[in-house]
Amino acid sequence: MDFRIGQGYDVHQLVAGRPLIIGGVSIPYERGLLGHSDADVLLHAITDALFGAAALGDIGRHFSDTDAAFKGADSRVLLRECVARVKAAGFAIQNVDSTVIAQAPKLAPHIEAMRANIAADLGLPLERVNVKAKTNEKLGYLGRGEGIEAQAAALLVKQGG
């Protein structure tokens, strides 16, 4: 079998006046993530992991942050389009594991909703999607609450190969 592993990463600055959307879930908080789209750091990292595993480049190659078509875009829509492109390249998604690093807010109450959204968008059973939340132990820009980071890994298998 032809297995492919992809790794994804994203980080966005926390700012006032923006909603906080992570894993397709709106999270009550006084600040949100700054970005061209909805700035869903988790879905962007997963999208990058999937494109990377299929050797299709990265999220910026497919959904440029200079393209007005993606201004304010729902990252769940972008993730579903990524899935379609990965499948068109002949791959099946096996699983995704991800980590969100945020000093605040606490994400644990939202993890299961994030997993459900991601599983639905990937067309996978829930047990093949994992989301973890960590703090940065008050270290660096993440520890000071200046931003939120996400990392993801994805496993694909080439169909018919």
Swiss-Prot record:
Pfam family, one: YgbB
Superkingdom: Bacteria
Pathway: Isoprenoid biosynthesis; isopentenyl diphosphate biosynthesis via DXP pathway; isopentenyl diphosphate from 1-deoxy-D-xylulose 5-phosphate: step 4/6
Protein name as annotated: 2-C-methyl-D-erythritol 2,4-cyclodiphosphate synthase
Assembly and oligomerization: Homotrimer.
Species of origin: Burkholderia multivorans (strain ATCC 17616 / 249)
Cell division recorded as keyword: no
Primary gene name: ispF
GO biological process: isopentenyl diphosphate biosynthetic process, methylerythritol 4-phosphate pathway; terpenoid biosynthetic process
Entry similarity comment: Belongs to the IspF family.
Residues engaged in binding a divalent metal cation: 10, 12, 44
Role played: Involved in the biosynthesis of isopentenyl diphosphate (IPP) and dimethylallyl diphosphate (DMAPP), two major building blocks of isoprenoid compounds. Catalyzes the conversion of 4-diphosphocytidyl-2-C-methyl-D-erythritol 2-phosphate (CDP-ME2P) to 2-C-methyl-D-erythritol 2,4-cyclodiphosphate (ME-CPP) with a corresponding release of cytidine 5-monophosphate (CMP).
Cofactor binding notes: Binds 1 divalent metal cation per subunit.
Residues involved in 4-CDP-2-C-methyl-D-erythritol 2-phosphate binding: 10-12, 36-37, 58-60, 63-67, 144
HAMAP family in the cross-refs: IspF
NCBIfam families: ispF (TIGR00151)
Cofactor(s) of this protein: a divalent metal cation
